[in-house]
């Protein structure tokens, strides 16, 4: 049994999703968004760190997975996203959690079956997979997708006789 915290980082909105995995069963524990309130980036990064630290304290995950940075057209946006990822990763490492990272294409493939899925498709599949009464917010759905991707990748490695702690499955380097 493992509890996985998935994170979809953003400098304004950071989504999180927590699932518990038992064998082939994935159980929804919680999800939501950390919305930062300040225009000053250092304050927003602090809010992301503190928000995820509280989520980690509340759910006690054993594994942490985060979406990789994608190439943005705007360099300033890419830098801010990278800094938000850094705040999230520091929160995980402070809790001694192993950190894994996955591309958006890997995450969408794990959830929807195609790496080119739209956000609405990811939200719909997350709602169906976890039998939720309504689709979660886009950032929370993406974060749940990150957690599912991590679980499926972990299960595939174990099934192939690999080590679940292998650095080859998207571990942060």
UniProtKB/Swiss-Prot annotation:
The keyword Metal-binding applies. It is an enzyme of class 3 (hydrolase). Binds 2 Mg(2+) ion per subunit. It holds the Pfam family RuvC. Its main location: cytoplasm. The keyword Chaperone does not apply. GO terms for biological process: DNA recombination; DNA repair. Keywords: Cytoplasm, DNA damage, DNA recombination, DNA repair, DNA-binding, Endonuclease, Hydrolase, Magnesium, Metal-binding, Nuclease. Mg(2+) 2 binds at residue 67. Its EC number is 3.1.21.10. It catalyses: Endonucleolytic cleavage at a junction such as a reciprocal single-stranded crossover between two homologous DNA duplexes (Holliday junction). The active site is at residues 8, 67, 139. GO terms for molecular function: crossover junction DNA endonuclease activity; DNA binding; magnesium ion binding. It comes from the Bacteria. GO terms for cellular component: cytoplasm; Holliday junction resolvase complex. Mg(2+) 1 binds at residues 8, 139. It is found in: Cytoplasm. Homodimer which binds Holliday junction (HJ) DNA. The HJ becomes 2-fold symmetrical on binding to RuvC with unstacked arms; it has a different conformation from HJ DNA in complex with RuvA. In the full resolvosome a probable DNA-RuvA(4)-RuvB(12)-RuvC(2) complex forms which resolves the HJ. The RuvA-RuvB-RuvC complex processes Holliday junction (HJ) DNA during genetic recombination and DNA repair. Endonuclease that resolves HJ intermediates. Cleaves cruciform DNA by making single-stranded nicks across the HJ at symmetrical positions within the homologous arms, yielding a 5'-phosphate and a 3'-hydroxyl group; requires a central core of homology in the junction. The consensus cleavage sequence is 5'-(A/T)TT(C/G)-3'. Cleavage occurs on the 3'-side of the TT dinucleotide at the point of strand exchange. HAMAP family: RuvC. Belongs to the RuvC family. This is Crossover junction endodeoxyribonuclease RuvC. It comes from Shewanella denitrificans (strain OS217 / ATCC BAA-1090 / DSM 15013). The gene is ruvC.
